[in-house]
């Protein structure tokens, strides 16, 4: 009888351990994914002979899901020209493939080139549109609607504080907005229209952007134009233009 009790107790302990282990097992679809990009560069100024090395980016991101319809992302740059910057920190509700809602800190939906991560950029430096005009990250909420059949499209729009990433305690009488529409009428072609209103100080700034690109074989052809105007004609209008042609040379895996 005593031996039977011991065996029953042992079996209960093993069953409890197996149950606990099963409870601690994280389903594959909920396992977080870690991504990273390290980009170093060397620059030499031919006019005065000055030169320097630089770690332009050292980005690390963590993203995943906590529920089938709830996703998250956190991204930090440990060396943005020597400075540490928190880039993305948001949660996203995606009930289906048609629409989603995002809340947190993110890149504002605007332009084509500004949305490229460092590992997706075609050149050592970003374009003027991506770096000086359309490079905006802010805290707010966005909604996105997409269609994959008929006329494929993606429409994104959002409201943002307008005070950047560090002044999140400020209260605002008005919010910034940004809207971006992507049309994909045929395969490998994209037409993007976007507009944005920001209020950096006491003057509202309005920006309008149109861009398109087409990919075929090894080629990527892209053109983008941005118009920036200030309320009450406070400053001169700004015109920004970006165009390039890229040809990919594929190499065998392992080389």
Regions found by a protein language model. Give the residues of each.
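A short hydrophobic/aromatic micro-motif that marks alpha-helical segments and, especially, helix-coil
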Residues: 19-20, 83, 165, 201, ...
């Amino acid at each position: 009888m005593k031996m039977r009790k011991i065996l029953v107790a042992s079996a209960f302990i093993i069953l409890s351990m197996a149950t606990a282990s099963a409870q601690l097992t994280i389903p594959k679809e909920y396992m977080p994914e870690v991504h990273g990009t390290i980009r170093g560069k060397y620059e030499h100024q031919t006019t005065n002979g000055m030169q320097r090395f630089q770690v332009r980016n050292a980005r690390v991101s963590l993203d995943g899901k906590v529920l089938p319809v709830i996703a998250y992302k956190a991204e930090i740059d440990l060396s943005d020209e020597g400075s540490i910057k928190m880039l993305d920190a948001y949660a996203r509700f995606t009930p289906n493939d048609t629409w989603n809602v995002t809340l947190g800190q993110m890149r504002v939906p605007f332009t084509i080139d500004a949305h490229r991560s460092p590992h997706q950029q075609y050149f050592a430096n970003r374009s003027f549109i991506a770096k000086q005009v359309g490079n905006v990250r802010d805290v707010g909420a966005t909604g996105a609607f997409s269609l994959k059949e008929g006329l494929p499209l993606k429409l994104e729009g959002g409201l943002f504080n307008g005070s950047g990433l560090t002044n999140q305690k400020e209260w605002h009488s008005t919010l910034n907005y940004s809207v971006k529409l992507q049309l994909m009428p045929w395969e490998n072609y994209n037409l993007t229209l976007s507009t944005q209103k920001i209020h950096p100080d006491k003057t509202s700034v309005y920006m309008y952007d149109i861009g398109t690109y087409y990919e075929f074989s090894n080629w990527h052809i892209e053109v983008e134009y941005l118009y920036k105007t200030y309320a009450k004609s406070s400053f001169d209008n700004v015109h920004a233009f970006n165009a390039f042609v890229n040809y990919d040379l594929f190499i065998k895996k392992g080389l």
